[in-house]
């Protein structure tokens, strides 16, 4: 632009500003909070001490001394970064070892399991949806699947059939009517906003009956469900050659990243064709080194003790939520939603809890359907029963004030 020339009009900024104003008017603008300390049940956030019910740190491992030490050890050994993509110099011994460990830990459903490590769960789901399908495939997706699965499905160029949430009769009818040469059924195991479990045994049976593959996203089950925390498939004692298992490592595992476990041939194909694996820098090896330490805790006696404590917290929370004037969702997992309804009422409840030093996030559209805004209470083995007593008193007071 020449000196002195008038500025070029930027209608995009005007459009964005109007969009932000609309979000404000609808009570839908999201605001980040800043943690000053490590992720834990008791934290300092935005300069205030709080009890946090917002994280997905289900086993309370994010600040575990063994994991912190392993992270530091990994950085000393491998440096701070990987230096490249997995196929161009960034694949370290820490990554390779972790993949072997994950295949053994979570791959009991397969006779020939292999694991592939990703930097995020979003990237892992994109890889599974895009590399294993294509224009000739049909994907059958639960209506409440996670956004990362939905985005992967959109990128896959496959035909898509959405079945009502957990409705196996409807899914069976769609499969009966399909003549696609490749069929993929896709489902979360634990649904992140309701906390309910997918009917996995029925999904596996339908997949085998129709010659379909079943991809399950166990983001909220890995580390928590099943013997030794091996996940939802292990909890249901399911085995099938047609399974693809996605797990995340930044929730119960307390570190970061994700992985896919499947038959070794499917994993080799993903290495060759999954764009979200190929065209990105590998995660720092220190992260993988810390995850290896996490698996030892998850699968050991301490992991069993943490899961037992978490189970007791879940049952206590289910009871206390029924004492409020709002609508609890029937969840037996660490995700305990409390449906309030309107955006404004949900935000008011969140602020009332915050005033008492409790961080419980408000979940609003488009994450959940309009009219079902809710508080999402996320439990951790790091919580105590005293923490729940504080939560109960605050919830009852807030619900009565809203009546």
UniProtKB/Swiss-Prot annotation:
Pathway: Cofactor biosynthesis; biotin biosynthesis. Keywords: Biotin biosynthesis, Pyridoxal phosphate, Transferase. It comes from the Bacteria. Its EC number is 2.3.1.47. The modification N6-(pyridoxal phosphate)lysine is found at residue 251. The keyword Cytoplasm does not apply. Its cofactor is pyridoxal 5'-phosphate. Substrate binds at residues 30, 146, 367. Pyridoxal 5'-phosphate binds at residues 121-122, 192, 220, 248. Catalyzes the decarboxylative condensation of pimeloyl-[acyl-carrier protein] and L-alanine to produce 8-amino-7-oxononanoate (AON), [acyl-carrier protein], and carbon dioxide. Belongs to the class-II pyridoxal-phosphate-dependent aminotransferase family. BioF subfamily. Homodimer. This is 8-amino-7-oxononanoate synthase. The lineage of its organism: Bacteria, Pseudomonadati, Pseudomonadota, Betaproteobacteria, Burkholderiales.
């Amino acid at each position: 632009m020449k000196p002195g020339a008038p500025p070029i009009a930027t209608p995009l900024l005007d459009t964005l500003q109007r969009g932000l104003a609309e979000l404000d008017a609808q009570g839908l603008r999201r605001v980040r909070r800043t943690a000053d300390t490590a992720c834990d049940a008791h934290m300092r956030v935005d300069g205030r001490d709080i009890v946090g019910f917002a994280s997905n740190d289900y086993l309370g491992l994010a600040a575990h001394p063994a994991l912190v030490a392993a992270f530091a050890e990994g950085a000393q050994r491998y440096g701070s970064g990987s230096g490249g993509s997995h196929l161009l110099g960034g694949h370290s011994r820490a990554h390779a070892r972790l993949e072997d460990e994950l295949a053994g830990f979570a791959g009991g459903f397969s006779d020939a399991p292999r694991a592939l490590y990703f930097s995020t769960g979003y990237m892992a789901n994109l890889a599974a949806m895009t590399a294993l399908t294509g224009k000739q495939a049909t994907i059958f997706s639960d209506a409440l699947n996670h956004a990362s699965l939905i985005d992967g499905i959109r990128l896959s160029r496959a035909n898509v059939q959405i079945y009502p949430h957990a409705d196996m009769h409807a899914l069976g009818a769609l499969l009966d009517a399909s003549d696609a040469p490749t069929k993929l059924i896709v489902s979360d195991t634990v649904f992140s906003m309701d906390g309910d479990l997918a009917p996995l045994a029925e999904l596996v049976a339908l997949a085998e009956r129709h010659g379909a593959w079943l991809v399950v996203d166990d983001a909220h089950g890995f580390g928590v469900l099943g013997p030794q925390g091996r996940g939802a498939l292990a909890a249901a004692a399911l085995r099938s050659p047609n399974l693809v298992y996605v797990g995340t490592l930044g929730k119960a595992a307390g570190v970061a990243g994700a992985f896919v476990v499947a038959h070794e041939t499917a994993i080799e194909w993903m290495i060759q064709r999954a764009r979200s694996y190929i065209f990105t820098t590998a995660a720092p090896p220190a992260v993988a080194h810390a995850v290896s330490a996490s698996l030892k805790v998850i699968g050991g006696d301490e992991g069993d003790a943490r899961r037992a404590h978490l189970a007791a917290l879940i049952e206590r929370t289910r009871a206390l939520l029924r004492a409020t004037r709002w609508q609890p969702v029937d969840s037996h997992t660490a995700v305990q939603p409390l449906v309030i309804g309107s955006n404004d009422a949900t935000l008011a409840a969140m602020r009332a809890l915050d005033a008492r030093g409790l961080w419980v996030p408000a979940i609003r559209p488009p994450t959940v359907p309009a009219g079902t805004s809710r508080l999402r209470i996320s439990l951790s083995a790091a919580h105590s029963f005293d923490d729940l007593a504080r939560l109960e008193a605050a919830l009852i007071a807030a619900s009565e004030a809203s009546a």
